[in-house]
Regions:
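Short active-site neighborhood of thiol/selenol oxidoreductases, capturing the structured segment around
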Residues: 50-64
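Thiol-based oxidoreductase modules, predominantly thioredoxin-like and allied folds used
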Residues: 34, 79-99
Length: 161
């Protein structure tokens, strides 16, 4: 009977979604039903906790280049690792279903999609990046994208002796 009880517990736990211990759940999909303001505030709180910067990626499921960027990160795991090591990434939906006008009005005008904003740990805009400048052919330029992510990553000063 103990074996059956243990098996029930194991199977029940196997179905549980793992949530990080600190409670932050990354926003990795464009979703018109999400509360973008809350998502950004949660990311800023996580940035405070981790010392990372916030990378807002605005776009939508309708956006061809948004899908190209997603695939580019999947195809270039070291670039994705660089992003994830230095940034709390939040996808902000912009679509007919939800323009997120109130939230996006706080940021510089967006010339095209996808568009990236880099925020400091207090939510201040450090960079508004037209991703067209990172493109090459039907994809992105690895050197340019790497330089962009590296250049805006937070620098931690070495302790003074």
């Amino acid at each position: 009977m103990k074996i059956i009880g243990c098996m029930v517990v194991v199977f029940a736990l196997a179905g549980c979604r793992q949530v990080p211990a600190h409670g932050y759940v990354p926003v990795s999909q464009y979703d018109p039903r999400r509360d973008a303001d809350k998502d950004i505030n949660d990311a800023i709180a996580e940035a405070h906790r981790t010392g990372k910067r916030v990378l807002l990626e605005t776009g939508g499921e309708w956006c061809k280049w948004c899908h190209i960027m997603d695939k580019y990160f999947k195809d270039h795991p070291k670039l994705a690792e660089l992003r994830d090591r230095n940034y709390i990434t939040v996808k902000i939906n912009f679509s007919e279903e939800n323009l997120n006008e109130k939230v996006l009005s706080r940021y510089p005008k967006i010339p095209g999609y996808p568009h990236i904003f880099i925020l400091d740990i207090d939510g201040k805009v450090l960079q508004s990046q037209n991703t067209g400048e990172l493109e090459e052919g039907q994809g992105y330029n690895l050197d340019k994208f790497t330089a962009f992510l590296t250049g805006w990553a937070r620098r931690v000063e070495a302790p003074k002796s």
